C-alpha cells in the first residue's frame, strides 16, 4: 500500500520504548514511572501548541459496566457522556499546522454494530431525542471559528472504534449508502489520517471481542494517499504529540498538548478525570474501590483486549498530565468522551468535569486570527 512516510514529517519519541518492549506488566509499569519525568522535561522544552480548543459533538448513553468498570455502585444500566472534537494548532517550518482530534461524524458512527443494535432496541425516536443530544457537527464547528476544509492538515482518533471517515477522506469507488453513483469526494481535500499501524492492521481480521465496535468495511476504499501510519510515540510539532497507549485497543494513542497551564492528555481510556484519581471521586463506589483494590485508575473497559496494558497506559496518561490548577489532585486528563450527570443515571454524576478547553487563538493559515467560540 502506498502511504506517506510519517518519519519524514514527525519526530520519533523514544522515552517509553523500553517500557513498550517489556512483556512483564508489573515491571513495565515501573519503567513507565521512571520514563515519565524525563519525557515531560523534554516535551515541555519543545514549546507549546498555539491553539487547543474543544467542541461538543453529541451526548449519548453508554453502559455503566464498561464506563466505570467494577467500581460504581449505582444500579443503573447506563451512564451518559459527551463526545468532543479538539482543534489543535502549532507553528513549525514557517507555517501553522492544524489537527482535528476525534472529528467523529456521529450519524455514520451510529451504524457501528453495537450502537445500531441499541437504536433498534430503543427505536429511532427515543434514541435520537430523549436519550441523546446533538450539538453542532464537525463542519459547523469549523465554520464557527473561521476554518475551511482545506485548512486541515491532519485528522486522528485515539482508536478506530465506531469511526467512518469516508466523507472526510474520500473513496476510490462509489459507496451504496452515501454516494451510490460516484466515489465520495473528500470533504477535507488535504487532510491525512494519522493512525497507528497496529490499529489499522487489525481491521481485516477482527477478533469476536472487537467486532461490535468497528466498521472495518468502511475503510476498504479509503484513498491510499490519505493514510499516514505511525508506530508508537511521535512529536507532531512544538508542544503536540501522540503517545501510544495500548490496551483499550492495540493501536490506541493519546493526544498530548503543552499549554499555558501545563500538559493536557486526551483519550477514551477513561471517561472522567476522576477515573485517574478515584480516591478523589464523589461517585459512589469509586473511592472504596480504589481503597480496597489499591488501583490507581478506573478503566473504560468495553473490549478488555489487554486489561493490565490499559491500566499501565492510564497510569502513564495520569503521570504525563499536569495537575489541574483548581484541584491539584485531579490530572489535566480530558476524556474524548467525558462523563456527565443525567436524570436517568443517578449515582454516576462526576465530581469534576473539564467540559471545555480553550487555549490560544485559532488562525487560518496565512490569514488573520479568529477567536474560537
Feature roles, as predicted:
Residues 1-139, 141-143, 151-163, 175-244, 262-270, 285-373, ...:
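Metallo-beta-lactamase
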Residues 84-92, 100, 143-146, 180-185, ...:
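Short amphipathic alpha-helices and their capping/turn segments at secondary-structure boundaries
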Residues 106, 161, 199-200, 246, ...:
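Catalytic metal-binding/acid-base residues of hydrolase active sites
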